UniProtKB/Swiss-Prot annotation:
SMART domains: HOX. One of its GO terms (biological process) is regulation of transcription by RNA polymerase II. InterPro entries: AP_axis_regulatory_Homeobox, HD, Homeobox_CS, Homeodomain-like_sf, HoxA13_N. The keyword DNA-binding applies. It comes from Danio rerio. Residues 223-282 bind DNA. PANTHER family: HOMEOBOX PROTEIN HOX-A13A-RELATED (PTHR45804:SF9), SEGMENTATION PROTEIN FUSHI TARAZU-LIKE PROTEIN (PTHR45804). CDD domains: homeodomain. It comes from the Eukaryota. Sequence-specific transcription factor which is part of a developmental regulatory system that provides cells with specific positional identities on the anterior-posterior axis. One of its GO terms (cellular component) is nucleus. The gene is hoxa13b. Its main location: nucleus. This is Homeobox protein Hox-A13b. Belongs to the Abd-B homeobox family.
Amino acid sequence: MTASLLLHSRWIDPVMFLYDNGLDDMSKNMEGFVGGNFAANQCRNLIAHPSTLAPSTTYTSSEVPVSGMGEPVKQCSPCSAVQNTPSASLPYGYFGGSYYPCRMPKSCTQPTTYGEKYMDTSVSGEEFPSRAKEFAFYQGYSSGPYQPVPSYLDVPVVPALSAPSEPRHESLLPVETYQPWAITNGWSSPVYCPKDQTQSSTLWKSSIQDTVSGTDGASVRRGRKKRVPYTKVQLKELEREYATNKFITKDKRRRISAHTNLTERQVTIWFQNRRVKEKKVVNKYKGIS
C-alpha cells in the first residue's frame, strides 16, 4: 500500500489518494457494508486517507507539481449514496485506485492529521490566494510522466556567490604598491592600486639605492653619481669653444670630448648650463638698469 500527495493542475487544494492492490476485493464488499445502496465506483470525489499512514510520510512543497493557481475552484455535488444514506459513516481505506480532484463535503470525509490541517472544506473560494501563500506552493513544472521538479524558489540562485574560494598562497613582493585587500568574496590575491603611484615611487627609488659591495669590498651607491668638478684645462677648452659658438655641433662635440677626456653627454650638458648661466646674468643686469 503506497500513499502520495498530488495536486491537480486546475485546483489548488492538495488531495490525498490511496492506491490499493486489493481494490476489487474492497469493491465487492462495499455494497454489503453500506446496506446495499452504495457502490464503490459512484463516489469519485471522496478522499481516501488511511489512518495507518505513518506520520513521518510527509511531502514538501517542492515534490508537488502545481499549475493554474489562480483558477476558480469547482464544487462537486455530494455523493448520491451519501445523500440517500446520511447516517452511513464510511471509514478510510475503502476507496482508491485514482485521485479525486473535487472538493468534498464533510459528510464524505473524516479528515485526520493531514486532512484536518489542509483540507478545510468550509473555506470559501475567495480565500484561496491567501491559502496558496500559506502552503508555500510555487509555480513549477506541470504534472506528467516526468519526475516533479522543484520550483525556482526551492533552488539557490547562485550558490557559489557566498562560498569562499580556495585560498591561493602567493608570495607578495616587498613593494608598498602591492597591498592585499580584504575582499568579502574570498579573494586572497594582491590587488594593485595605481592611485598611490606618486607617493610610493619615491620609496621604490630609495630602495634601489642600496649599497652593494664592489669587487674591492668598498661600498658603492647605485644611485646618482657623485659630482666631479672639471679641471682648469677642461674648463679653458670649453670656454674657448663657447666663445666661438654658443651652440655646439656633433663634430665639434666629438672633438672636444676627445681633447678633454669628457663624454659627449658631459660636453652637451655643460653647454646647456653655460647658456642658462649667461641668460641669468643678462637678466640680472637688465633688472638693475
